[in-house]
Amino acid sequence: MNLKEKTRALFAEIFSYPATHTIQAPGRVNLIGEHTDYNDGFVLPCAIDYQTVISCAPRNDRTVRVIAADYDNQVEEFSLDAPIVTHDSQQWSNYVRGVVKHLQQRNNAFGGVDMVISGNVPQGAGLSSSASLEVAVGTVFQQLYHLPLDGAQIALNGQEAENQFVGCNCGIMDQLISALGKKDHALLIDCRTLGAKAVSMPKGVAVVIINSNFKRTLVGSEYNTRREQCETGARFFQQPALRDVSLEAFNAVASELDPVVAKRVRHVLSENARTVEAASALEKGDLQRMGQLMAESHASMRDDFEITVPQIDTLVDIVKATIGDQGGVRMTGGGFGGCVVALIPEDLVPAVRQAVAQQYEAKTGIKETFYVCKPSQGAGQC
């Protein structure tokens, strides 16, 4: 039974009437463009075929009722006429509450909803299960009540909910790709303007995500430190963000910068350039050049931004040794663990899977998790 069938059946069973709509919103993986989003730079993610699915129907009152199928059918209920505050024990419900609260501030022309939620985006793997949930909930209200909100506004609403209601800092990429993703395409997103350009993916290429399952500990504090170092760099150049600094300008005065800040700045500037070129390489079907850019990105994250760990570097080395110049591999996400992403010909997937299974655990003592994904459509009815 797929997620649509599961949520529709559960909806009818619990609420004793059929759902009128089923909405999905996907998770995502970032192919290239790491730690560029909060520097007003470029990112190149694609939506993946793991998603949050919500079967739903409008109510004729002001109550929101939610069933979390993946949490033992826990029930959440709140009124649109009372102040929406955080739930003490059901953390999942705060994503729903936050999205609804911020939707009210944007466009309050909606009533109550019954919904059943289920998803298969792996949690804690850096594949944006939370953004997928936020965008799915926003799309439910937009579709049921014909709200005049586009995908970018639904994405911004989800980001606000996560930052201000749930209390977790995030850029806009995760929600934007979940809302705007296009089947068989990646999306080159300008994080300053929120402009997005669909980039066709070469035929016969698989998106492989491998979770190192290394438990991240430093990610919060180190993320904030990197952000501060980037802001220091932008101030040095008297620019609002590193997006506005050219590599030429940087190279001319790099020796005057604090050495660590200089390394951080060099990563962001070079990564922005790589991301724009990667979009062009993908469109041309030049998997070899894409692989080189991904390798340069990983080296920059390892040596200049210093956010990889030995387990991640080991995974990258195993995949690279298996695929040679037929595709690319790099760490993806915030760093200090998490996942690597590889773009490889579909016929090489079994060899990569076997090489990783044979070598990664033997070298690190940790068992990986292996996902093969397709670039998928963004949020909407399913």
Curated annotation (Swiss-Prot):
This enzyme's EC code(s): 2.7.1.6
Main location: cytoplasm
Pfam family, one: GHMP_kinases_N
Keywords: ATP-binding, Carbohydrate metabolism, Cytoplasm, Galactose metabolism, Kinase, Magnesium, Metal-binding, Nucleotide-binding, Transferase
GO molecular-function terms, A-Z: ATP binding; galactokinase activity; magnesium ion binding
Site entry (Transition state stabilizer), positions: R28
GO biological process: galactose metabolic process
Biological or metabolic pathway of the protein: Carbohydrate metabolism; galactose metabolism
Residues that hold Mg(2+) according to the record: S130, E162
Active-site residue list: D174
Segment forming the signal sequence: none
Catalytic reaction equation(s): alpha-D-galactose + ATP = alpha-D-galactose 1-phosphate + ADP + H(+)
GO cellular component, one term: cytosol
Protein localization: Cytoplasm
Xref: HAMAP family: Galactokinase
Family statement: Belongs to the GHMP kinase family. GalK subfamily.
Biological function: Catalyzes the transfer of the gamma-phosphate of ATP to D-galactose to form alpha-D-galactose-1-phosphate (Gal-1-P).
Name of protein: Galactokinase
Organism listed in the record: Salmonella paratyphi C (strain RKS4594)
Lineage: Bacteria, Pseudomonadati, Pseudomonadota, Gammaproteobacteria, Enterobacterales
